[in-house]
Each structure stands twice: as C-alpha cells, then as structure tokens.
Design a protein with these regions (language model features):
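Gram-negative outer-membrane beta-barrel transporters
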Residues: 238, 569, 687, 691-694, ...
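C-terminal beta-signal and adjacent terminal beta-strands/loops
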Residues: 803-849, 864-868, 874-970
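Periplasmic N-terminal accessory/gating domains of Gram-negative outer-membrane beta-barrel systems
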Residues: 81-82, 87-101, 109-212, 216-221, ...
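Periplasm-facing N-terminal accessory domains of Gram-negative outer-membrane beta-barrel systems
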Residues: 20-123, 139, 157, 181-184
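Membrane-embedded beta-barrel scaffold of Gram-negative outer-membrane proteins
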Residues: 112, 396, 400, 619, ...
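Short loop/turn motifs that connect adjacent beta-strands in outer-membrane beta-barrel proteins
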Residues: 212-214, 229-234, 268-272, 327, ...
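Transmembrane beta-barrel wall of Gram-negative outer-membrane proteins
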Residues: 253-345, 373-395, 565, 612
Length: 970
C-alpha cells in the first residue's frame, strides 16, 4: 500500500457519498434571547456545513439554502454558554423554527457545550481521529480501569503484553490525567497511575498525531478527566465477585472481588464541592488452576492484607472544587494507586523474545512463592486555577507532582541475604521418586547403566527469582495555558508552556547474592565488593520545558488548526559533570558529540526540537466533512539508554554490558491522516480514515570499545539512533442509534506495522552471536495485527412498563461486544530432521524444528485469528428514591481459545490438554503436538530432554469469566 492509494480511497468515498442530488432548499430561522430579551450579534452555525448567520438587532436570524436533512445547530455569544441543538430537521421548501435562550457562562461547573436533544453520534468538526467515552458509557461496560475503557475503540489493540495504538509500541502512548502526564517514565509500560473506573468522568483516546498541547507521545494520547462533586449530594457503593457460593469451584471463577465506592457533594453550596472515590480489585487470575502463591509479599509493605490475592489493585481519589466567584475556579486533587502482583509486564524496559509474551512466570509454577513480585505505588497531586480575564480570554495555571515507585523482589525477600548458605539459583532438578529411562520393549539387563529422566522443566529446587529492581520517578510540573478568541469565534489562540523538574533513581541487580558474604568453617566471612552478577545504579535530575501554540481559524465551515510545540530537554548535571571530568566511561567521540550538539543555559546543557502541527476540516456537502491532519511528535529515549553504567564507581563488569549514551536523540513520529466524516442522518454516521506514520531515530544497539578502571579495553553495548518503522492503514466505522433504546457501532481497520526490529535489543542478539548486526530487512513488527474488527451494541429499556409485557423485564440495560482480530505474529520454523531413537538409533524420534535463518522472514506469519464476545447486563430496582443495580458480566462469553503464545510449528497455541491425564506417547506422530526445539516435547522424554513444557496456561487469553455484582447509589 502507498499513501496515494489511501488518498484515492478517500477521494472515491467523498465522491460516492457526496454526489449532489437535485432538490428544493429549506431554511432554519428563529430568535436568540437571554433572560433579559433579544441578543443581537449572536452566532448561529449549522455544523457540518459552511452555513451560518449572526442575529439582527431584534435577535432574529435566518439560515437559508439548506438541503433537506437533519442538522446540529450551535448557538453562541460572548460571555454566554454555548448550546447545541441536535436533530433539527429541514424539509424541502420549508422553514424550520428554532428559538434559543442562552445563559451567562460560569466556570463554576463543568466547562463544555450544553446539548439539547440526543447527543451527536460524531463531531463533524473534528479534524483528527479521537474517540470520547462518557461516564454513562463507561458504566455500561465490563471495565475496571482506563485500559479496559479504551480497548474496544478503533485503532486500539490490547493484549496481555500491553496496549498498542495504530501500530505503535506500548511505550509510545501518552497518558494524561486531568491535564497531567501520569505514566511511569521508567517502567516502560505506557501507563502509571491507576484510576478506578468509578472515578472516571470522561476518557478520550486520540489515535492520530496529538495536537501541540500534548507531548512525549509518538503513538496516541489517552486523556482522562476524573469526576468532580456537584451541588447535589450523591454516593454509591458497589461489590462484584466471581466466587459466590458454588461459583468458586468452576472454571469461570478467578477468585476475583471488586469493591468500590464514591461520595460527593457540596460543602458550601455554589462555592465548595468535594468528591472522593476508592476501588480495590483482587484476583488470583485464571492461572490459579495451575499455581497460586500462598501469600504474595512485598518488601515495600509488610501488611499482608494489602495483597490477599495474586493480583491486587488499589486506587483512590480525593478532589475539592472551589468557586469563590464567577469566572474563577480552583481545583485541588490527590490520587493514589497501589498494585502488587507477579506480572512481569509491570516492568518492560529490557527483553528480546519476550516482547509479545504474557507476564505469567510459568517457570515458577511449582514454587510461585519464590517468583518475582512487583509493587507499583503511584500518587498524583495538583492544584489548578482557571481564571477568566475578560469576555474573550482566560488562563489555566496548574502545579502538579507525580511520584511513581516500582519494586521487584523475590516475593518480599530482602535484596540479598546476609549470608549465602544455600543454593539460590532456580533450577529444575530430578525429583523423587525418580523415573528410570529404559527400553519399554524388554527388561533392562542387570549390567546396564541406568539413566533417569530429568526434572519437570519447571523450577523446583527452592531457588528464587534472579532480578531485584527498584526505581522511583518524581516529576514536578508547572503548566500555564492562555486562550483568547474573537467575538465571533472565527479565531482562537491557545498558547502556553510547561516546565518539568525530574528526579529519577534506578537500581537493577541480577543475581544479587553474587558477592554476598559466605560464612567459612572457621567462622569468618568472605569479603567481596561484587554487587550481583550484573548491576546498574544511578540517580539523575533531568529537566524539560515546552512552549506550544495553536491557532484555530474558522471560515465558512472550514476549520484550520495550525500550531507548533518547541521541546527542550537537559540530561542533567550528572551527565554534564561526567563529560566535563572526561570520565573514562564516556568514549571521547561520544563526549565531543555531546558538547557539539548541546547548548549551555542556566548551568545545564540543553537540546531542542520544533514539532509542527496542522489539521484542517471542511464540509464537502451538508453533514459531510473531509479532514486532514499532519504532525510531528517525539518521545525521549528511556533513561536507562542514556545513563546506564556511566558512573565510574558503579560499573557493571559483566560481558558486553550496557553503556549509556548521553547524546541520544528522541524518537520521532511523523503522522499523516486523511478522513471523511458522514452524519448520514441524526441516527446514522459513517467515518472513513486513511493514515500513515513514519517513525525514525528509534533506539538500537551498537558495539563500542571502552577502557575499564584498569585500562583494559572492553566491549560494551551502546544505544544509538539507528532504527525506523512505519505504519499505514485504513479505518472504517459506522454508528447507529434507534430512538433512546438502542445504540450500536461497528469499526474495522486494516493496517501494517513494519520496521527493522521489534525491540531495542534485537540487534544485541546479532552482536552476541555473530559479532555484527545483520538488520537491514524491514519486516512486520511483533505486535502487528493487520485486521481488527470490533462491534458493540447497547440496549437500554428504562421504562415502568415491562418490555414485551414480560413481568420484571424493565429498567434494564444490556451491552454486548465482539472483537475479531488477526492472530499473534511469529517467525516460522522449518523441519530439519528427526532425532535418533535412543533405543534403535533410527531417526524416528522427536521432530527437530529450527527457526528459519532468513532475517526477511522475521515475524512474517500470523497465528490463528482471535475472536471473542463480552456481555454485561444490569437491572435497576428503585428503593425509596434510591437505586439498587444488579449486574452480570461475562467475558469471553463462548469460552473461545485465542493463542497469545503461538506454536510456530502449527501456527496455533499448543493444544489445551490436561498434562496429568493425557497419554502423550499415544500422540507421537501427531503434527498438532509438534513443538520447536527450544521447548520440551512431552511425547519424547529421554535423559537429554530440556526446556520448559508447552503447557503454560497463559498461552491463551483468559477463558470465560462470570462476575456478579450489586451497586447501591443515592
């Protein structure tokens, strides 16, 4: 596919859908008033057209020459709130009367546009792909957090490894909560602060290039707005469980419980309001049928009640809103989340073949109490002032602090023991009773050497997880934003800045017991300055600033947003001092390059980049808008690639260890988008979008020679800007509404994401194996999912009379959604031969499959497609003016198997069998059970068997999950 093809598709769609038809013209006319009388000079716009008018001295207006159809009319006036009237029908040769009354604008409540009538299905003026999920829509879906909320939007792919927007990496997503970046900059997950679904007011996901107001995102931006209190007291308490009574013994129970509450209302009516919410979700996950630790422990917190299950999430929010006078609003908020679990995807910085693997630690299935436990604690606090300056301008000033910390330990153990008195490396050993390996055809002669079968392939020797990790990130941000618009709103200027002070600390140690004291027989202890097998320790204080401006022009239906964002950043005094001191850890060429490419200012050395932004929308015909967007975005490299092992004191002396590159440049994304929005009727909408993204200056690995403290030359892995990727695709979506009781949508996308490598470490493997990098082939990326189709429908019947006359079938809501998606990418294998039979010497033993040598075939195949259905049903009961809601949620309704870990021999997941009851010898010769050489094949057990068994329960998505719930609100 090429960009020209996408343009041709959109042009054809515009011609086909926009062909004019001969008909009479209609008009809309009326009067605009306030509580005092007519409003002269008010603006009346017919959205999705180039038509509009200004009211005359008596407040009247008339908009003529409108084609028959349904329209949305926006009425606005300086100093008054904007109101949109939807579903205004115009008929041939007739004039539709629409009178409007505006109220003075106040920032005391939620800013926004008042909608009279059914909300528009789409925003025909929007010049970029963005989807907004309202609080009511969130309540209708089976969701727990922000990722759940946006997972079913077009262009968004979520799986157990992360969330990907339009082919970008999971780490490229921007995550903003109430105007503050809320992702952990060191964890590499794309998210950080966890916000409970009951605290969400609105979630918007922007899948195209973000506008100038957002930064540090090269894939998409998730914008979260949390709830505020109102002048009406309200409270709610909810409980959901999948283990009620006999449900706990079924396969659809993950031993999950979810408790949440929220309360809000006035403290001083019309002046001071509050809102408080909390959520706790605890689950043993579907892997509980294989293994569950007796107790998940964290070395950060001793309280075991914080982690009653395998996966534990806590989230809380408190917010105060103060409106001392009209035009002034002050909001203060504190949010905190805590997660304790054993999911390795909590820390996604390094890794090569694990890029698309789920986080379940299958190797520790026999001793889960020795696996890695991850604890992430995040809190966000801010104070935001909104001040109206006059009837045409206002400012926002926000001071915020985000603090995130993540600890990974061996299920709560100290970073290393005071005394090494046992084997700590986890291994799979032969267990008792042993199994003798012999010829099954005849008895074993007495003088024959006996062999036993090896261990199970899973760790069983009491060894513990080999990585100990701790990091924290503090980010203090001051942000200011100024907005000014003309009286007729034909021009709007938004300009501002944000300044960030960061403080990062990173400690990562592999096999930390290496170098720990060992008590000798004479009572003395060994002495060592070794800090684990390998380690990386640093603390840095980088700085960032940004200046941004967006100019919006409106002219006869055309809306153009032209803007730019200037990003500046400094690596911090830590790097500047090492460069100035000519530290031996920084090669001379790298040091000189850093000095040449940075500019000294305010005691630090800075870099800068200008990012232009443009998006335009204009009506092709009534209710049909063509839009185009173009923008540059950037994301700074992960700090480990900048600072690793630069400190001469904390030097990792392991073979080919990482070396930070302080002169790394940011990764760049250039996004293009062309789309067509069609409001076919007030209840039907169709969108067609083509997009293209060029990504370059991605991080890869090169070999560099540096001198160690003794002067000996050593090879190090240096991160450099040398990789690229690109994404291209087409999206279609159709939305349908039937009165107030049915709403549905269908979206489909076809895209391709390709590049030189899928992780920052792909080139490292070539360097270690071959001494050079053979990475010149552009191949599909590991997370590429070409086809993604989603459909959902919401049926709402909130009437006293029963539906179809069935008693009790009233005041209910039903939500059903389905997803069909291309399967997981994998690199094919080829059949080499069969192993020799240990009894006969013939080559009729285990089939040998090896990964193909051709690098052009990397991730060239896709596994079997994924398909599943989710359902949520609820019934409301009125109790003395309050509401009690009973709910049923079923995920993966039809219990379909969708392979996350693909067997490259078959292109499917390893068959879902019970290893304890299956006769694997009888399955010899069955190609469905063939596996590559790096996995254990249970059909051919012999003394040389090695590798993990193929029974990892996380090889499939979660099976059917049934959750019951009750919610009481008043």
């Amino acid at each position: 596919m090429t960009r020209a093809l996408y343009v041709a598709v959109l042009a054809f769609s515009a011609l086909a859908l926009g062909a004019p038809s001969a008909s009479a013209q209609g008009a809309i006319a009326g009067t605009v008033t306030d509580d005092q009388g007519p409003l002269p000079g008010a603006s009346v716009l017919i959205l999705g057209t180039s038509r509009g008018a200004a009211t005359l001295a008596d407040g009247t207006y008339r908009v003529a020459d409108l084609r028959a159809g349904d329209y949305t009319v926006r009425v606005s006036y300086v100093g008054y709130g904007t109101t949109e009237y939807t579903g205004i029908t115009v008929r041939d040769g007739a004039t539709t009367t629409l009178d409007a009354e505006l109220a003075p604008q106040s920032l005391g409540g939620d800013e926004g546009i008042t909608v009279v009538g059914d909300a528009p299905l789409i925003d025909v003026e929007q010049a970029a792909s963005a989807y907004t999920i309202s609080q009511d829509e969130i309540a209708a879906r089976p969701v727990r957090d922000v990722e759940d909320v946006i997972a079913n939007q077009a262009g968004v792919v979520r799986d157990p490894t992360g969330l990907y927007i339009r082919g970008g990496r999971a780490t490229e997503t921007g995550y903003v909560v109430d105007g503050v970046s809320a992702k952990d900059p060191l964890a590499g997950t794309g998210f950080g602060l966890d916000v409970g679904s009951n605290a969400l007011r609105e979630v918007e996901v922007v899948t195209t290039g973000a506008d100038a107001l957002a930064g540090d995102a090269t894939s998409g931006v998730v914008q979260v707005k949390t709830r505020e209190g109102s002048d009406t007291f309200e409270a709610a308490l909810a409980y959901q469980t999948d283990n009620l009574g006999g449900l706990a013994d079924g396969g659809s129970s993950f031993m999950e419980d979810n408790v949440e509450f929220n309360v809000g209302g006035p403290i001083l009516r019309d002046k001071l309001r509050f809102f408080v919410s909390g959520q706790g979700t605890f689950s043993d996950e579907f892997t509980r049928f294989v293994s569950t630790p007796d107790q998940v422990r964290s070395s950060l917190y001793d309280a075991e009640w914080l982690a009653p299950r395998l996966s534990n999430r806590w989230a809380g929010l408190g917010k105060l809103t103060f409106v001392p006078r009209q035009g002034t609003k002050l909001v203060g908020s504190f949010q905190r989340s805590l997660a304790i679990n054993q999911n390795t995807r909590m820390l996604q910085v390094t890794g090569n073949d694990a890029v698309v693997r789920p986080g379940y630690q299958y190797a520790f299935a026999l001793q889960p109490d020795a696996a890695n436990t991850y604890t992430q604690d995040a809190n966000l606090s801010y104070l935001k002032l909104t001040q109206v300056l006059n009837d045409r301008s206002f400012v926002d000033v926000q001071l915020s602090r985000l603090f995130t910390r993540l600890r990974s330990d061996a299920n709560g153990r100290d970073w290393r023991p005071d005394n090494v008195d046992s084997e700590l490396d986890p291994e799979s050993l032969v267990d008792f009773p042993v199994t003798i390996f012999g010829d099954p055809r005849e008895g074993i002669p007495a003088d024959t050497a006996l062999f036993v079968l090896p261990g199970p392939g899973l760790f069983n020797n009491g060894g513990i997880a080999t990585r100990w990790h701790d990091h924290f990130a503090e980010e203090v941000t001051l942000r200011g934003e100024y907005t000014r618009y003309t009286p007729d709103e034909s021009y709007t200027l938004t300009a501002g800045f944000d300044a960030r002070l960061n403080d990062y600390q990173w400690i990562d140690i592999v096999r930390p017991w290496v170098g720990a004291p060992i008590v000798l027989p004479d009572g003395t202890t060994t002495q060592s300055n070794r800090l684990g097998q390998s380690s990386d320790i640093w603390r840095v204080k980088p700085r960032r600033t940004a200046f941004f401006a967006t100019n919006q022009f409106r002219y006869r239906g055309l809306i153009a947003n032209v803007g730019a964002r200037l990003e500046t950043w400094a690596a911090g005094a830590y790097v500047d001092d090492l460069v100035e001191q000519e530290a031996f850890t920084i090669p001379e060429a790298l040091r000189q390059g850093y000095l040449d490419d940075t500019t000294p200012f305010l005691g630090l050395r800075w870099k800068a980049r200008l990012l232009p932004k443009l998006n335009v929308s204009f009506p092709v015909r009534e209710n049909q808008v063509l839009f185009f967007s173009y923008g540059h975005s950037m994301r700074l490299p992960h700090p480990t690639y900048v600072y690793a092992n630069l400190d001469p004191f904390y030097q990792d002396r392991s073979f080919f260890s990482d070396l930070g590159n302080p002169n790394l440049n940011p990764e760049i994304d250039i996004a293009y988008e062309l789309g067509l929005r069609n409001q076919l009727t007030k209840d039907d909408a169709l969108n067609v979008t083509a997009f293209w993204r060029d990504k370059f200056d991605f991080i890869t690995v090169a070999s560099v020679t540096v001198a160690d403290p003794t002067g000996r030359e050593t090879n190090r892995a240096l991160r450099v800007n040398g990789d690229f990727a690109r994404v291209r695709g087409i999206e279609l979506s159709y939305l349908k509404r039937v009165s107030d009781w049915l709403r549905g949508q269908v979206s489909a996308s076809y895209s391709r994401a390709s590049g030189l490598s899928s992780t920052n470490n792909d080139a490292l493997q070539d360097l270690l194996q071959n001494g050079n990098v053979d990475n010149t082939f552009e191949t599909p990326l590991a997370w590429d999912r070409p086809l993604d189709v989603k459909a959902s429908t919401t049926f709402l019947y909130d009437r006293p009379a029963p539906f179809l006359g069935v008693p009790g079938l009233n005041r209910f809501r039903l939500f059903v959604e389905t997803t069909y998606r291309s399967g997981q990418r994998y690199t094919p294998v080829e059949f080499i031969d069969n192993e020799r039979n240990p009894f006969t010497g013939e080559r009729d033993w285990r089939p040998i499959y090896e990964t193909v040598d051709d690098p052009a075939l990397r991730f060239s195949e896709s596994g079997r497609a994924w398909w599943w259905f989710d359902l949520r049903a609820e019934r409301r009961f009125g109790i003395a003016g309050t509401d009690l809601v009973a709910s049923l949620e079923v995920s993966n309704l039809f219990d379909q198997n969708n392979a996350v870990i693909v067997n490259p021999v078959t292109g499917r997941g390893y068959p879902d069998v019970d290893p304890a009851t299956t006769d694997f010898v009888a399955l010899r010769g069955d190609a469905d059970y063939d596996v590559p050489s790096n996995l254990r094949d249970p059909r051919y057990e012999d003394p040389q068997t090695s590798g993990l068994p193929p029974f990892n329960p996380a090889r499939y998505l979660a099976p059917r999950h049934v959750v019951l719930g009750l919610k009481y609100s008043f």
